[in-house]
A protein has these predicted regions:
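Histidine-centered active-site/metal-ligand motif
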Residues: 21, 76, 146
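Internal alpha-helical scaffold of NAD(P)-dependent oxidoreductase catalytic cores
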Residues: 14-16, 29-123
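A generic, residue-level signal for flexible/boundary positions that often mark functional hotspots
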Residues: 1, 17-20, 61, 125, ...
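Short, well-ordered alpha-helical microsegments
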Residues: 3-7, 50, 143
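Generic, ordered loop/turn and secondary-structure boundary motif
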Residues: 8, 24-27, 37, 76, ...
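Rossmann-like NAD(P)(H) cofactor-binding subdomain of soluble oxidoreductases
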Residues: 1-32
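NAD(P)-dependent Rossmann-like dehydrogenase/reductase catalytic/cofactor-binding core
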Residues: 108-176
Length: 176
């Protein structure tokens, strides 16, 4: 999440600093490089060669966005949320199913098609087109039942994420 500002005193060496970041989950240092051609890259740094770096990566077939150093941490937080926090949410939901009597294997197996289907729909139709469920249907009774069944962190996470889902539902159904 570091910006090119980390290269302090770089002008003294007549050099230019850049921060180039793939928006990509690298979970295996020996295999992930094989599909990095699918990654979206961000580039931040000295204006002198920004366009050169952008063209270089676009020449490899990667989409590129130039961002400011001030936005680097917020950009990285968005990436961490959609990647790493999604893993945490999946783990929490598997735990919830285990608490309902599912084996660990069956909890994972049960949620996998739901996660894959929603991920594919989000990618294809964006969040507003992918949204389904009780908040999208304006089914307050089901949402309240869900909240009544939860406690602690699971309840707080459900509430907090529901606020964001409600924004998507309002975009999808502005007439409501």
């Amino acid at each position: 999440s570091l910006s090119s500002a980390v290269f302090s005193d770089i002008e003294r060496y007549h050099a230019y600093g850049y921060s180039i970041h793939p928006l990509f989950a690298i979970n295996d240092k020996y295999e992930s490089y094989k599909v990095i051609s699918q990654a979206f890259f961000t580039i931040e740094g000295d204006p002198k060669y920004l366009n050169w770096f952008q063209k270089l990566f676009e020449g490899f077939g990667n989409p590129v966005e130039i961002i400011s150093g001030q936005d680097k941490v917020r950009y990285h937080a968005a990436a961490a949320m959609v990647s790493n926090l999604y893993v945490g949410l999946a783990n929490l939901c598997e735990e919830m199913l285990r608490n309902c009597g599912f084996s660990s294997a069956n909890a994972h197996r049960a949620l996998s098609p739901l996660m894959m289907g929603n991920t594919e729909n989000i990618v294809q139709y964006r969040p507003v087109g992918a949204l389904t469920g009780p908040i999208e249907r304006n089914d307050l009774s089901t949402v309240m039942d869900h909240l009544d069944s939860l406690s602690g962190e699971a309840r707080k996470i459900y509430q907090d994420l529901s606020v964001e889902v409600l924004k998507v539902a309002r975009e999808k159904h502005p007439e409501r």
